Amino acid sequence: MSEGKVQQKQQARRAEIVVAAQKCFAEKGLHGASVADIAREAGLSVGQLYRIFASKEAIIEAIVSEIVNARVGEMIDENHNLARKAAVLAGRIPTSAATKSDNYLLMEINAEASRNPRLREILMQADRRLKEEGGRLSQRNQPGLSDARRNAASELIAVLTEGAAYRCELSASTPVDKADLEALYNMIFDRLFDEQA
């Protein structure tokens, strides 16, 4: 078998393991899903899985990388469309089931990262990448912002995004007028990216 075919097969196997891990984490939680569960779901032995991923953390790193790549792709596609971002955060544009699942997993990884330095480093790398990409888009769209302001804006958007993800299920119990919420997000974004402020 050629080297290219071997790499293709390994990439396909990696992808199968990642999908199996996502399913196991969704069903059993990050702590409850074992490497044996993931291997079984992927149709592999534990030994075969360990030939592809050195640890459970390595699988989590691959999942986080996929989520970040998808989110960077969305950021690029949306081209710093803050009005759309406000509508999404307010819940006027529905979040896909896959995005909700990713959000729940990231929240669980974040909680575990307080006890696991490797997971903390994985999340910090992901956060840096998202902020760098967001900063590049912001630089293109608001070239007059200082780097300090751009960095602060990226942090605030991360806080708002993660907070909205956390609150999405909770807010159903105390309904909020989504149009009012969207208007508030737009007001924040207008002020945040005001080059004169």
PLM regions and their residue ranges:
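Helix-turn-helix
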Residues: E16, A20-A58, A62
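Hydrophobic/aromatic-rich alpha-helical bundle segments in the mid-to-C-terminal region
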Residues: R120, M124, R140-A197
